[in-house]
Structures are given as structure tokens and as C-alpha cells.
């Protein structure tokens, strides 16, 4: 059955399906929307007591529900300045060193950091010998993405690509998955050096948003788009540790890259398949 599921992903019209789902998710259909949200809550066992708006009737469309805010204080931020924090609610897929420009995906699969970053050679060079962490957001999870550490935005890259599912089954069976799917790469300058936040699209994930650009929707095609941002002066965008930096419509994956010698060690309990909660300690900063 697993082989059938993977085979179907290669032949199904993933972009068309995602566009259709995106239109439905943005549609305001009153009681139909409310009924669908209630079904989703029950199907995925979502704890709505954590949501700022716990009632399904509070959401005019599915997208509002998918990107729902949490109650203030429900995710306390680790205040130890020696640690960066989890950027999302989800589960660790993989993490570890970037070895010879390669990032581990799953048993028998890896991919290049250069490909992940949209073949931006200068960017990839900044993360040689560094560390990575890949976190999967399931449909049930909180879908907003936050800053692991204070950082100033220096560059954004949009990389067109496939829209394979990014669940654990697909990660174990589709070579180079995260470097094949559509993605948005945001690079920040931080006190520990450059940090890349790679927001990876997936099947029926209708769009990726950032707080500075809104929904990232370059023209359809195979061209990579880049935007450079000032890191000093009145137009520089600096986001504090724990601040929202983006969001997914439904769920997907975040890949983080850090420079060599930026991180000392991952926090206790942070390992593949471990559950992540935004704001908790993720990794200790190198002294």
C-alpha cells in the first residue's frame, strides 16, 4: 500500500489539486465552512482549547482556521539566552551536521544544501560545515512559524518545484524531497551568524506567507526569484526571538540551517521524531 501511495504522488496533478484546494480553503461558505471545520477538528483531534478563538463559527473560511492564533501565553518562550527556541509546533524529522554540503533526509536519502537554497552558491557556502534541523508540521498542528533567535532579514528566495506530500512516508521514499518541492528561503543575520529558514510547500498547501511579503506568489514558471533586504537603517526588518515570521495554509515542513560553530548541542530530548512546541528550548548556542 505504501508503494501505491508514493506512486500516486508521481502521477497526480499536484499543482492543479493544490490550486483547487486553495480556492476552496479561501471560500466563505457559512454553515458549510463551519461543518467542514468541525469535521477537521474531530478527524485530527485538534485541541481547540489552545486557540484564541476556540469555536468553529469564529472562522469565516478554512484558511482562517488553518492559520489560527493561539491564546496569549499558551507557548511560553524559553528565556535562557544561551538557547534558540523551537520555531513551530510539529515533530523533528531529522537534524544534525551538514556534511560536505549534504543534508540527511531519511535512511538512504540525502540532498544538497545548494539545491535546497535554490542553487544560490554564495548562500550555500555560508552554511558549509554547519547544522540543520527539519521539522514536520502535521495538519493538526499550529501553522504559524516563529523566530528561533532574533534576526535581521537579508534575503528571500522563491524556488519553484514539485508539491509532493512531506509526511514521514514520503520523506522516506522520495529522493531529495525538500530540495524538489516549491519553497521559500529566508536568510537572517543573527548574533550566531547567518540562519536560513526554508519553508517547504506540499500537496494541497495552498500558499506560503511571510510577515514582510504576505503570500509569496511569483509568476508561474521555473524561474528562481530573489529579493535582497537592507540589514541596517530605517528599512531593515529585525524580528525578535519568538516573533512570527511566516505561516502555512494547512501544514508542511520547515528546514533550518545554521553556520559552522553556531550551535553547541541540541537541547535534551530534541531528536528525530520528538515532538516540538514553539518557544521551548531547541539548541544551545556555541560559547
From Swiss-Prot:
Active-site residues, as the UniProt record annotates them: 89 (charge relay system), 146 (charge relay system), 252 (charge relay system), 252 (schiff-base intermediate with substrate)
Cellular component, GO, one term: plasma membrane
Residues at the site labelled Cleavage (non-hydrolytic): 251-252
Subcellular location: Cell membrane
UniProt-listed Enzyme Commission number(s): 4.1.1.65
Biological process according to GO: phosphatidylethanolamine biosynthetic process
UniProt GO MF annotations: phosphatidylserine decarboxylase activity
Cofactors that this protein relies on: pyruvate
Pfam family, one: PS_Dcarbxylase
PTM text: Is synthesized initially as an inactive proenzyme. Formation of the active enzyme involves a self-maturation process in which the active site pyruvoyl group is generated from an internal serine residue via an autocatalytic post-translational modification. Two non-identical subunits are generated from the proenzyme in this reaction, and the pyruvate is formed at the N-terminus of the alpha chain, which is derived from the carboxyl end of the proenzyme.
Keywords: Cell membrane, Decarboxylase, Lipid biosynthesis, Lipid metabolism, Lyase, Membrane, Phospholipid biosynthesis, Phospholipid metabolism, Pyruvate, Zymogen
Disulfide bond residue pairs: none
Reactions listed under catalytic activity: a 1,2-diacyl-sn-glycero-3-phospho-L-serine + H(+) = a 1,2-diacyl-sn-glycero-3-phosphoethanolamine + CO2
Recorded metabolic or biological pathway in which this protein acts: Phospholipid metabolism; phosphatidylethanolamine biosynthesis; phosphatidylethanolamine from CDP-diacylglycerol: step 2/2
Pyruvic acid (Ser): residues bearing it: 252
NCBIfam families noted in UniProt: PS_decarb
Protein's job: Catalyzes the formation of phosphatidylethanolamine (PtdEtn) from phosphatidylserine (PtdSer).
UniProt protein name: Phosphatidylserine decarboxylase proenzyme
Amino acid at each position: 500500500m505504501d508503494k501505491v501511495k508514493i506512486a500516486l504522488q508521481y502521477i497526480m496533478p499536484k499543482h492543479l489539486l493544490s490550486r483547487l484546494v486553495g480556492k476552496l480553503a479561501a471560500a466563505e461558505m457559512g454553515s458549510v465552512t463551519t461543518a467542514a471545520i468541525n469535521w477537521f477538528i474531530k478527524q485530527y483531534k485538534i485541541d481547540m482549547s489552545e486557540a484564541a478563538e476556540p469555536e468553529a463559527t469564529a472562522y469565516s473560511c478554512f484558511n482562517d482556521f488553518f492559520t489560527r492564533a493561539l491564546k496569549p501565553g499558551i507557548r511560553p518562550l524559553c528565556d535562557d539566552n544561551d538557547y534558540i527556541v523551537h520555531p513551530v509546533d510539529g515533530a523533528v524529522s531529522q537534524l544534525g551536521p551538514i556534511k560536505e554540503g549534504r543534508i540527511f533526509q531519511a535512511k538512504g536519502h540525502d540532498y544538497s544544501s545548494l539545491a535546497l537554497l535554490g542553487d544560490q552558491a554564495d548562500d550555500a557556502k555560508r552554511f558549509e560545515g554547519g547544522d540543520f534541523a527539519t521539522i514536520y508540521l502535521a495538519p493538526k498542528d499550529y501553522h504559524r512559524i516563529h523566530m528561533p533567535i532574533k534576526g535581521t532579514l537579508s534575503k528571500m528566495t522563491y524556488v519553484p518545484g514539485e508539491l509532493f506530500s512531506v509526511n514521514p512516508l514520503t520523506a522516506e521514499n522520495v529522493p531529495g524531497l525538500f530540495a524538489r518541492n516549491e519553497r521559500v528561503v529566508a536568510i537572517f543575520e543573527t548574533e550566531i551568524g547567518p540562519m536560513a529558514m526554508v519553508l517547504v510547500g506540499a500537496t494541497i498547501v495552498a500558499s506560503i506567507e511571510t510577515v514582510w511579503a504576505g503570500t509569496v506568489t511569483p509568476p508561474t514558471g521555473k524561474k528562481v526569484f530573489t529579493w535582497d533586504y537592507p540589514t541596517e537603517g530605517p528599512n531593515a526588518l529585525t524580528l525578535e526571538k519568538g516573533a512570527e515570521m511566516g505561516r502555512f495554509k494547512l501544514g508542511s515542513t520547515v528546514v533550518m540551517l545554521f553556520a559552522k560553530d553556531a550551535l553547541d548541542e541540541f537541547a535534551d530530548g530534541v531528536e528525530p521524531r520528538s515532538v516540538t512546541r514553539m518557544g521551548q528550548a531547541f539548541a544551545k548556542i556555541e560559547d
